[in-house]
Amino acid sequence: DALRNLRDRTGETTQLIVMTDNKCLILEQCISDQPIKVSGKVGMLVPCYSCAPGKSILADLPKGELQEYLNHVTLKKFTPRTLATGSSLKKELKEVRDCGFAVDLAEGLEGIHCVSAVILDDYHYPVCAITTIGPAFRMPEERFEEIGNACLEAVREIRKKILD
């Protein structure tokens, strides 16, 4: 199972996320074995713009759908690092497209970092995202590339299972 393998590889909680009604919905998760861990509840909804899985999905939406999202969502700050303007979010989404994965530096909750990659269908449309979430002290920026690459590997594994 790709989520379990990713959790074991990174040591952190992993989740499978979809976008619904302009929010991210946790479909499934594998909770970390660490004594201090981060997890959400399956079925929990969070704003897309303030979390890595949401940004990974938004980055690959067609431009018209992204603009529609921005027209319908009020961007507000949850922490000092939340991207709360359309221009700052669009700039970050370009970076996500360029590197292949999204990051969340405590943008939704203080002390929580996430790294995520999107699963695209055969038409390059975002289906869902896989994310690794953990406390900032164990997921510092220095680990983002390593974790991002692990997420991309898990995406390839999941995509092969669900789309082949």
Predicted regions and their residues:
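Residue-level structural signal for beta-strand termini and adjacent loop
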Residues: 30-32, 132
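Intrinsically disordered, low-complexity terminal regulatory regions
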Residues: 1-29, 146, 153-154, 158-164
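Short, solvent-exposed recognition segments
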Residues: 36-108
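Structural detector of well-ordered beta-strand residues that form the stable sheet scaffold
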Residues: 15-17, 47, 102-104, 129, ...
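Short, charged/polar surface micro-motifs in flexible loops or helix N-caps
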Residues: 21-24, 32-35, 63-64
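Residues embedded in well-ordered beta-strands
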Residues: 15-17, 56-58, 113, 129-131
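Extended hydrophobic
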Residues: 85-154
